[in-house]
Amino acid sequence: KAKPKNLEKLKKFPITVLVCGNDKINIKNLLKILKQKKIKNILLEGGGITNWTFVKENLVDDIIITVTPYLVGGNTATTLVDGTGFSKIIGSTKLKLKNVRKVKNEITLHYECV
């Protein structure tokens, strides 16, 4: 949930802020509003919960993952997808590797959801 003080800070920028839901994002309402505004593509840079919400609703076309040379983790580390997840691999989203790119000391993997 966006804090009111953070929403207030955004007012100084030439952007439109969409509030879609009370305590969490109402994805279907958000996509309906974006469609009305003729927006057909979005870049989702969410946390694990937001990412999982879009994946479980089959709303993701591509996934781009950057592998960096840092080891982080632990019990409270952010994950790519959070929430209930898929109980079995057979039911999970299938990915097809489209591209691999190396930039300096990082590797970017571009997958298509099939």
Task: Outline where the language-model segments fall.
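Enzymes that bind and transform nitrogen-containing heteroaromatic metabolites
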Residues: 1-43, 47-114
